[in-house]
Amino acid sequence: MMGICEMKSCCSWLLLISLLCSLSNESQAISPDGEALLSFRNAVTRSDSFIHQWRPEDPDPCNWNGVTCDAKTKRVITLNLTYHKIMGPLPPDIGKLDHLRLLMLHNNALYGAIPTALGNCTALEEIHLQSNYFTGPIPAEMGDLPGLQKLDMSSNTLSGPIPASLGQLKKLSNFNVSNNFLVGQIPSDGVLSGFSKNSFIGNLNLCGKHVDVVCQDDSGNPSSHSQSGQNQKKNSGKLLISASATVGALLLVALMCFWGCFLYKKLGKVEIKSLAKDVGGGASIVMFHGDLPYSSKDIIKKLEMLNEEHIIGCGGFGTVYKLAMDDGKVFALKRILKLNEGFDRFFERELEILGSIKHRYLVNLRGYCNSPTSKLLLYDYLPGGSLDEALHERGEQLDWDSRVNIIIGAAKGLSYLHHDCSPRIIHRDIKSSNILLDGNLEARVSDFGLAKLLEDEESHITTIVAGTFGYLAPEYMQSGRATEKTDVYSFGVLVLEVLSGKRPTDASFIEKGLNVVGWLKFLISEKRPRDIVDPNCEGMQMESLDALLSIATQCVSPSPEERPTMHRVVQLLESEVMTPCPSEFYDSSSD
């Protein structure tokens, strides 16, 4: 009898323990929000380590990187994963985050369609998907988000029309679909009618009053929905380059370029023959907004006639040729070898955007030739060559006024990229060989956008390979992440190069274990900063020099926060260098 009781007691304890274990396991089960986030993580093919911390072993997603939860409900309300090199599709399970208010996935490498399930996240107030590679149509279901206030899908490869349902978003105050492949008439009803042209530019096949393009019906006549009496216009709005992280391998391109230059020097006409064969093997010409008044046949014929005498340079992005047309106009042709066919679509899209950017102090991209193995970029040809050549390779010396004007021109070009483009453009490779000069020695910034286009995952390494080591900001060397302030640092180095007439890593600096920035700091400590100036520079004005040294010193500050913006730099140049007042820089350095 006692045995039976003991058995019953034992079974009761086992049942209780089993129940407690079951309850314990249930309490540790991951939440539905966590499961949705893990679905997203599992879809990612590549990223930095930011979301590696998301693990099913940690059942509380509120502790995960980039995730914020409501304190009471413990539901996910914010997902912020910007600038983390995330590559992969956005899975439909994202729609299960029905308490989500803020979705920030911009500046990554997400691709594929935007899931229609996003329309299930009815608590959303802000969606930021810009600067990715999303394709396909904009889901009409996004019009089912009653609380949505901000929607940014700019700088992707979205196609199709803009859904009319978005006009129902009564709280929408910020809307941007610029720089995509959207087509058709922009909905004129509802909230979308209140947004400006900047929300839609960069979509060449959109029409409507927002972009000053009259819509046509199927017969080719102006649509009855368009304003009467308005002539059809081409969309002349500026296409703005994305800060999107395009796939590329600058290291590979640089090595190919150097190898191409080696072949040119050692094997003579081998590269030229391959270029002629490449162009003759099925090339097509893309012109931007009628900038090239020539037929494709005429241009290809000229390309086939290029020989080794037309090579005028070989840099980090490719070999450069001088191309003369029959009407006397001259262009610079930059040859960039293709990386892979999948890269073409994004590359061509970015080239189209670059080709639309026009400014007095920028080198214009007129079009390109798409050949089987390379892209041939057609730029304006500037007879003055590069600033690097003017400073270091020619017999004649630049006088003071010329140097100051070059500095101001370069500053204005870079300031335009930083402050007058949306999204802002980071050059990433400011150096003297990327500052070109016209016949009057007026400066123009070249190669903007290419460093980002061909960016390798280890971008700081590829830039060093390209020969710009002396221009890199210290934080860029450490992190590889470029910002406007890394450009400002490079500009400060450029100013010192122009003033000294020496390259940033001149042998005279290296012997002392310094570069031009270190040399300036040494001279300041010795209370003789003016000694940095090229002794062969004629017409120097001391007050302007002191102002320039002060600006350069601010630009090359070790702390990015202490560097001025390029807009501020231009203001200082115009107020203190062009019309100098007595400077305190030299006095403060001489105390």
From Swiss-Prot:
PTM annotation: Autophosphorylated.
Residues recorded as bearing Phosphoserine in the entry: 386
EC number of the protein: 2.7.11.1
Residue numbers bearing the Phosphothreonine modification: 462-463, 468
Catalytic activity: L-seryl-[protein] + ATP = O-phospho-L-seryl-[protein] + ADP + H(+); L-threonyl-[protein] + ATP = O-phospho-L-threonyl-[protein] + ADP + H(+)
GO cellular component, as recorded: plasma membrane
Expression by tissue: Expressed in the root meristem and elongation zone, and in hypocotyls of etiolated seedlings.
Location within or outside the cell: Cell membrane
A single MF term (Gene Ontology): protein serine kinase activity
Signal sequence, renumbered to the chain: 1-29
InterPro entries in UniProt: Kinase-like_dom_sf, Leu-rich_rpt, LRR_dom_sf, LRR_N_plant-typ, Plant_LRR-RLKs, Prot_kinase_dom, Protein_kinase_ATP_BS, Ser/Thr_kinase_AS
Extracellular side: 30-238
Other facts: 'Fei' means fat in Chinese.
Protein name: LRR receptor-like serine/threonine-protein kinase FEI 1
Organism: Arabidopsis thaliana
Gene coding for it: FEI1
